[in-house]
Amino acid sequence: DVLVLDKNKDSMADEFERSGIHVIHGKYASVRNPLNLFFLYKYIRRYDFIHAHLFPAQYFVALISLLCRKKRIFVTTEHSAWNRRREKPWLFRPVEKLVYRCYDAITAVSKAAKIALDTWAGTGRRSLVVYNGIPLRRFINATGYTKKEIGLKSEDVAVIMVARFFSQKDHLTPVRAIALLPEKYHLFYVGSGDTARCREEVNRCSVGHRVHFLGRRADIPRLAKASDIGVLASFYEGFGLSTVEIMAAGRPVIVSDIDGIREVVEGAGLLFENGNERDLAEKIRYLTEHPAVYEEVACRCEQRSLDFNIDTTVKEYTTLYTNLINGRGIK
């Protein structure tokens, strides 16, 4: 079963339910509502094994673990190498050391996320890396849209960034990079969220005819195949799952040179200086103007994506869960 604090049902919940997974939705408008503590407790006491993701659910579940009389196993996952709470160590470090002590095991989505958490909260003995994974064949075997189907000419270059619009992601730098490139370069944004600030930058750079907002989509494999280059610009990152999806589609990727995502594209994709639109634009142009280099990077990216198969992720979690249930720790 999956319990989501957000009371609003979305397409992902529908997909889970079609796969036979029971999805329970919260009852409050804000996921931070303290009453969620009681809502969660009502459900958690029905289960023997609880796996929490993200703030504030991690806090709520940690508190509930202290209230449970019956022995249960609690696991959480660290999804990022940084968050805003770490800007105030005098306040949050003592709190989070206590929070993470409530968990029997902590998985991190990358080595960078694990190192950052261990340094922050002293979790080294109970943490381990379990990389995210994707259903590779869905992307490898996808049939991409034609350039005409996505509104482009055959000679146009499609650059795609798949990322929700929120503070972690840097959607402005790719816009500025596209503005530095010739007219044939187009940028496609796939993801939900507030696009107002990004649209303002698009207007400021006068590239409204070359930047396309597609919103949340269920056809990402086809869009990935239709693109020429994948980009992920972030201020901080734990993993960068969308980058693996683009690589699995056989497309080269260019990502911010930061912890987490650097680890994912290691030895395959290209890195650009974080926030440097000129560096990003130069790398986009270089790939498209040097076909042999493009093919080499694309091939490396597709090969690298094979390291992030969802089957491997499932196997590693199954091993972890089994060890915890049998009292063998995180081994």
Language-model segments: what does each one mean?
Residues 31, 35, 115-119, 126, ...:
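Acidic anion/phosphate-binding donor-loop and adjacent secondary structure
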Residues 157-180, 196-197, 278:
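A conserved mid-protein helix/loop that constitutes part of the nucleotide-sugar donor-binding site
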Residues 3, 252-255:
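Short hydrophobic beta-strand element within catalytic cores of glycosyltransferases
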Residues 52-60, 78:
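Short His-centered aromatic/hydrophobic patch
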Residues 1-31, 129, 193-195:
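N-terminal strand-loop element at the rim of the active site
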Residues 216, 235:
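Aromatic "clamp/platform" in nucleotide-sugar-dependent glycosyltransferases that forms part
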Residues 9-17, 118, 186-209, 293:
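Short, structured helix-loop element that forms part of the nucleotide-activated donor/catalytic region
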